């Protein structure tokens, strides 16, 4: 027997002894009873009788991972509580929730405590003390009571108003967005172009008060009464949908929980069944008895069925971000110049963070040598990097409203279209080429209208021993202020007595994906701070790799860095350092124009 199996056997034995000594009338569950509760023979369980006039049982269940997991409890013979707060399918009680932690060295204490929590929950549910929890976890209770497996996938603004929105009716799911344009963009990004896609009206109803389960509608008439009682100005929107819909339409309920979280629930409304007299029988007319267009919405609703369905929010990832950040970034436009190992990863992080509009610019093709440290893989070799990244990112992040590739250099792009970067909120230059980036720096300071946004430069030192993120605006210190005339940085963080060989194509860069990840995070983090107004140029941040990374390649901290900013010692740290203006820099001689 394995170590973990032995630990489980010992823990189950201790719990069995505790049950026998503590709970009068308890019985061990046999395999048939375990299967009836949705468990198999790898589980252990007991029936614990509940005291009191209402009787019933509480099933104690231990899964195969016990004691390294929490005990579960389920109600038996208590149909009156099956729809009570914190009671899930088949009477399972929700106590600690996902991720609950236990003292894995004292299984009896864990079971005893959890048993007490289960009894307390039952007593509270019997007394009706937990009903406000229906609103706190509204979407979970709605999902528990769905009556149709077809989900609604939504991408909707959390606006506190009812309105007609747009729906695409697919076979596996319906997709709901604010309008047909947004719906088409999302679906095209995710699944590719399909000119046959058609869009229908759907209703988004803002509920001022979220319903409890007994008020969940099971037909369109009850849905209308719920809206009339709980939604300010939602009824005209619903009635309009009833008057204009054909066979089937989607309704999304939206409201705020007691904690302020915005939740959604779905409803499918459809006409009566087809008559069963044959395949050619006409469908019952929901407007019968009224002239066309004159049937009251209340009658139309009463004559239609509805099904509760699950809502799958395609923007649910925004809930894992700091409040409001995703919505702000959705309106930002950035350009990424250079889509190599650094630029590709930074672009991905920005899209994951919610940036809504992005242009990737790079003239080069993806080569086998970079397969181990790039967002692209072997299936993209010999393809243009910008184009391949856009094709990869679109289905991954369909929320991006605009994602374009320019398979050329930024210089060629601007010669073709001088305003190509005009509307950017931020330009990221991750080219790693002094000639190109000094030109970009001078263009920003030239007083022309081609580059109006701040520029965020990012680069690696040799063997990724350090990484730098430097934001430069139209005034103050410029890129040249910290470099010599041929692109040698004045204060490097590292020095490498043994340099990589230099061939006709330039020096070989020695680093892997793990070395690269902190640099990508460094640059993307500063980009987000700039876009959200939490930082302003000029600003420089640097990542200093762990000292063993340097030692492995024969590198060490540069004396000039130590003199200016202190000894990094063991490294592995992020630091913010000044980027002072150089009075002798040529930027002092260039005209500067501030664009509003």
Predicted features and spans:
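Strand-helix-loop interaction patch of compact alpha/beta domains
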Residues: 1-57
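Glycine-rich phosphate/adenylate-binding loop
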Residues: 143-297, 422-426, 430-596
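Compact alpha/beta protein-protein interaction domains typified by the UBC
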Residues: 34-99, 108-112
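Glycine-rich phosphate-binding loop and adjoining beta1-alpha1-beta2 segment
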Residues: 363-399
């Amino acid at each position: 027997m394995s170590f973990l199996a032995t630990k489980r056997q010992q823990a189950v034995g201790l719990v069995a002894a505790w049950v026998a000594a503590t709970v009068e009338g308890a019985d061990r569950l046999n395999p048939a009873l375990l299967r009836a509760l949705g468990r198999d023979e790898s589980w252990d369980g007991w029936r614990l009788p509940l005291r009191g006039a209402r009787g019933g049982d509480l099933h104690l269940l231990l899964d195969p991972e016990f004691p390294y997991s929490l005990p579960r409890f389920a109600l038996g013979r208590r149909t009156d509580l099956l729809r009570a707060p914190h009671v899930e399918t088949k009477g399972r009680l929700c106590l600690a929730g996902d991720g609950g932690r236990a003292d894995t060295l004292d299984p009896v204490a864990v079971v005893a405590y959890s048993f007490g929590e289960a009894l307390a929950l039952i007593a509270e549910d019997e007394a009706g003390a937990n009903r406000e929890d229906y609103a706190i976890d509204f979407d979970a209770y709605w999902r528990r009571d769905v009556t149709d497996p077809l989900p609604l996938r939504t991408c909707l603004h959390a606006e506190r108003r009812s309105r007609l929105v747009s729906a695409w009716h697919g076979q596996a799911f319906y997709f709901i967005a604010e309008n047909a344009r947004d719906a088409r963009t999302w679906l095209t990004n995710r699944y590719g172009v399909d000119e046959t896609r058609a869009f229908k009206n759907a209703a988004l109803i803002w509920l001022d008060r979220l319903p409890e389960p007994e008020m969940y509608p099971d037909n369109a008439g009850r849905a209308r009464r719920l809206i009339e009682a709980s939604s300010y100005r939602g009824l005209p929107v619903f009635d309009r949908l009833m008057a204009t819909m054909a066979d089937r339409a989607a309704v999304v309920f939206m409201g705020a929980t007691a904690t302020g979280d915005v939740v959604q629930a779905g409803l499918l409304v459809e006409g009566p069944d087809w008559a069963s007299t044959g395949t050619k029988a006409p469908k019952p007319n929901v407007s019968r008895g009224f002239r066309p267009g004159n049937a009251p919405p209340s009658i139309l609703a009463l004559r239609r069925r509805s099904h509760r369905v699950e809502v799958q929010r395609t923007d649910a990832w925004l809930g894992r971000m700091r409040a409001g950040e995703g919505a702000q970034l959705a309106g930002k436009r950035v350009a990424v110049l250079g889509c190599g190992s650094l630029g590709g990863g930074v672009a991905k992080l920005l899209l994951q963070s919610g940036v809504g509009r992005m242009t990737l610019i790079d003239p080069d093709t993806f080569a086998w040598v970079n397969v181990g440290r790039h967002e692209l893989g072997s299936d993209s070799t010999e393809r243009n990097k910008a184009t391949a990244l856009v094709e990869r990112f679109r289905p991954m992040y369909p929320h991006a409203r605009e994602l374009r590739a320019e398979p050329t250099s930024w210089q060629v792009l601007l010669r073709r279209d001088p305003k190509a970067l005009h509307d950017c909120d931020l330009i990221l230059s991750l080219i790693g080429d002094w000639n190109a980036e000094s030109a970009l720096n001078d263009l920003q300071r030239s007083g022309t209208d081609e580059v109006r946004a701040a520029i965020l430069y990012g680069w690696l030192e040799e063997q990724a021993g350090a990484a730098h993120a430097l934001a430069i605006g139209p005034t103050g210190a410029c890129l040249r202020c910290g470099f010599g005339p041929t692109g040698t940085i004045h204060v490097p963080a590292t020095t490498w007595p043994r340099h990589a060989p230099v061939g006709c194509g330039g020096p070989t860069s020695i680093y892997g994906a793990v070395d690269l990840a902190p640099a990508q995070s460094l640059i993307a983090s500063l980009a987000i701070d700039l876009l959200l107004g939490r930082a302003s140029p000029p600003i420089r941040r640097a990542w200093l790799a762990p000292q063993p990374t340097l030692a492995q390649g024969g590198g060490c901290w540069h004396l000039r860095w130590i003199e200016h900013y202190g000894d990094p010692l063991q490294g592995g740290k992020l630091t913010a350092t000044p980027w002072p203006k150089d009075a002798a820099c040529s930027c002092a001689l260039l005209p500067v124009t501030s664009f509003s």
